[in-house]
Amino acid sequence: MKQQVEVKELKEGKYVIIDDEACVIKSITKSKPGKHGAAKARVEAIGLFDGQKRSYIGSVANKVYVPIVERKSAQVISITGDIAQLMDMGDFSTFEIVIPDELKDRVKEGEEVSYITALGKVKLDIRT
């Protein structure tokens, strides 16, 4: 799910969709309006699911999409290799997710973990 907002309403630390990917905004720089045009904005962001750096340059009056990012909790039902089966604690639905290498030693069966969902993608969100 996503909603539309103007570029001038974006803030650092919030989310934006760039190249059909949900991204976390790292910096925003705005130029002043000139004699013949509107103010421009440069948005630097990092992909929420792939970690790639992306940027958007456009007028501050342009509209961009902002993803609706949800943080939820789930219980780890089973682990098979690098795939964990999780059960959402809110609606009790089950789904599978790939465990990143850096989190393999921290995810255990029976424990509760938090995850992020946006634009139909899911990612574990275990804070250090």
UniProtKB/Swiss-Prot annotation:
Taxonomic lineage: Archaea, Methanobacteriati, Methanobacteriota, Stenosarchaea group, Methanomicrobia
Protein name: Translation initiation factor 5A
Gene3D superfamilies in the record: 2.30.30.30, Nucleic acid-binding proteins
Family note: Belongs to the eIF-5A family.
InterPro entries given in the database record: IF5A-like, IF5A-like_N, NA-bd_OB-fold, Rib_uL2_dom2, Trans_elong_IF5A_hypusine_site, Transl_elong_IF5A_arc, Transl_elong_IF5A_C, Translation_prot_SH3-like_sf
Gene name linked to the record: eif5a
Residues found modified as Hypusine: K35
Species per Swiss-Prot/TrEMBL record: Methanosarcina mazei (strain ATCC BAA-159 / DSM 3647 / Goe1 / Go1 / JCM 11833 / OCM 88) (Methanosarcina frisia)
Role according to the record: Functions by promoting the formation of the first peptide bond.
GO biological process: positive regulation of translational elongation; positive regulation of translational termination
